[in-house]
């Protein structure tokens, strides 16, 4: 029965792991709902300011903010939003694949790259992969604050204003639904007018007290809001991916337990049959 004992031990071990993954699934469900609420609360502001900025990109203001001016691209910056923890399926891996592909296109064109990394997984990836990380922040927790991001974002904005980078993009996972998280690369600056806005409307604004003072503040708030929204959505995507990963792990553990239980029963039956045969053989010999 040595084989049966070993199988029994494996079954007990897998059942213990199954309890852990099941508990983690339930925790992820709760955290995902809270993350979705935060995402829904911040999304209207992020979308509205994006619309206003889109109108500005099509307008002809008396003051052209540096974020509104296209220039030859020699160096680009990425704000990479990753998670702090693992056990969330291929969420970070898919994000890094998308980013590396975009970086490869830039490098083929002779464009250099600077990185601002949000999240421990992103920092660990670029330590191994290589890259010029100029700013990093991690351990934002389950309720990230925009105040925690301002310092890192400012590093990239200052680099753009000083002419050290010519384009800034944010890389993150978009929360589509519970089953789908989409890695995206979105250009933040210089501003990009959406085609629909460009075709249908041309907007002009009156600025008070003056265009420079208003736009200087608005442009910074725009970038900060988009990065914060990316962090909040990535957090919701992380919890959804973790919930699915833990559910799959729990289900797979159940299937493995069933298979091992069948093997155990067969091994036990074979051992009993052998014992009976030995008893019968011994009785016949007597």
Swiss-Prot record:
Which InterPro entries does the record associate with it? ATP_synth_F1_ATPase_gsu, ATP_synth_F1_gsu, ATP_synth_F1_gsu_CS
**Name this polypeptide is given:** ATP synthase gamma chain
Q: Which GO terms describe its biological process?
A: proton motive force-driven plasma membrane ATP synthesis
Q: How does it sit in the membrane?
A: Peripheral membrane protein
Q: What is its main location?
A: membrane
Keyword RNA-binding among UniProt keywords? no
Q: Does the keyword Cell inner membrane apply?
A: yes
Q: Which organism is it from?
A: Pseudomonas savastanoi pv. phaseolicola (strain 1448A / Race 6) (Pseudomonas syringae pv. phaseolicola (strain 1448A / Race 6))
């Amino acid at each position: 029965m040595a084989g049966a004992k070993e199988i029994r031990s494996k079954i007990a071990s897998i059942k213990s792991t199954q309890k852990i993954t099941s508990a983690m699934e339930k925790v992820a469900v709760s955290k995902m709902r809270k993350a979705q609420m935060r995402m829904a609360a911040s999304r209207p502001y992020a979308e509205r300011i994006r619309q206003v900025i889109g109108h500005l990109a099509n307008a002809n203001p008396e003051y052209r903010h540096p974020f509104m001016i296209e220039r030859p691209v020699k160096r680009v910056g990425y704000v990479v939003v990753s998670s702090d923890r693992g056990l969330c399926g291929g969420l970070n891996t898919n994000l890094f694949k998308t980013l590396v592909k975009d970086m490869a296109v830039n490098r083929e064109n002779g464009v250099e790259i600077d990185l601002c990394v949000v999240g421990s997984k992103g920092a660990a990836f670029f330590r191994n992969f290589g890259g010029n990380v100029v700013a990093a922040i991690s351990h934002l927790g389950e309720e990230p604050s925009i105040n925690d991001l301002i310092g890192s974002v400012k590093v990239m904005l200052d680099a753009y204003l000083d002419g050290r980078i010519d384009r800034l993009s944010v890389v993150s996972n978009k929360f589509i639904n519970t089953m789908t998280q989409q890695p995206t690369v979105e250009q933040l600056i210089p501003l990009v007018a959406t085609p629909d806005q460009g075709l249908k409307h041309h907007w002009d604004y009156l600025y008070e007290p003056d265009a420079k003072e208003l736009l200087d503040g608005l442009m910074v708030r725009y970038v900060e809001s988009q990065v914060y929204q990316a962090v909040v959505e990535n957090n919701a995507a992380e919890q959804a991916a973790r919930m699915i990963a833990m559910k799959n792990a729990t289900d797979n553990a159940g299937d493995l337990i069933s298979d091992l239980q069948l093997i155990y029963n067969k091994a036990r039956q074979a051992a009993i049959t052998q014992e009976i045969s030995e008893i019968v053989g011994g009785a016949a010999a007597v």
